[in-house]
Curated annotation (Swiss-Prot):
It comes from the Bacteria. One of its GO terms (molecular function) is chorismate lyase activity. This is Probable chorismate pyruvate-lyase. The lineage of its organism: Bacteria, Pseudomonadati, Pseudomonadota, Gammaproteobacteria, Pseudomonadales. The keyword Lyase applies. Pathway: Cofactor biosynthesis; ubiquinone biosynthesis.
Length: 188
């Protein structure tokens, strides 16, 4: 039987999020309570690869939207962009075994879209992580932990993000965990 695209309510989207420098600063310091979520919030290396290892059948990326857009004021500040400066914004669902596990949002300043950076606009359904972690030019900065303003059950409550640098270019990658990812008994 073929796998369907992700089943999810259409209103599921990237929620407003409060960002912290660490799990402890976000109040996620109790392993007994936050253990499975902590695992996903602290995965080192490629998050995409960790999700692929969790899959029993198939991992895929669904594009929700991508194109030039204005980053949020907080994202612009994090990337040192002028207010209302356009950037390439990509929002996707990362799905495993036919179910959405993660919403991801990437903000890429226009200055990073030249030369090798042109590939970032043409990823299609390929995971961004596969590109970033296959290129030694890209270096990841520290992970930040996000507490999301969840709209209802099933919406992201936790997130992680980091800056990736290549020379003077930086892009911001946020991964918003859907509860079914860390409530599942199989972490990977």
């Amino acid at each position: 039987m073929p796998l369907k695209d992700c089943d999810q309510p259409p209103e599921l989207s990237i929620p407003p999020t409060f960002w912290y420098r660490s799990l402890v600063a976000a109040g996620l310091y109790c392993p007994e309570v936050h253990g499975p979520a902590r695992y996903w919030l602290t995965v080192e290396g490629s998050f995409t690869r960790a999700l692929q290892q969790k899959c029993q059948e198939r991992f895929h990326v669904e594009i929700l939207r991508e194109g030039f857009s204005t980053p949020t004021p907080e994202e612009a500040k994090r990337l040192n962009l002028a207010p209302r400066q356009l950037a390439w914004v990509r929002e996707v669902r990362l799905c495993g075994d036919g179910r959405p596990w993660v919403l991801a949002r990437t903000v890429i300043p226009q200055t990073c879209l030249h030369g090798h950076g042109r590939r970032l606009r043409n990823l299609g359904n390929k995971p961004l992580g596969a590109y970033l972690f296959s290129s030694p030019e890209w270096q990841r900065g520290p992970l930040e932990t996000g507490l999301c303003k969840a709209r209802s059950n099933g919406h992201p409550r936790l997130a992680r993000r980091s800056l990736f640098h290549r020379g003077s270019c930086a892009l911001l990658v946020g991964e918003y965990l859907l509860p079914r990812l860390y409530q599942s008994p199989n972490r990977g």
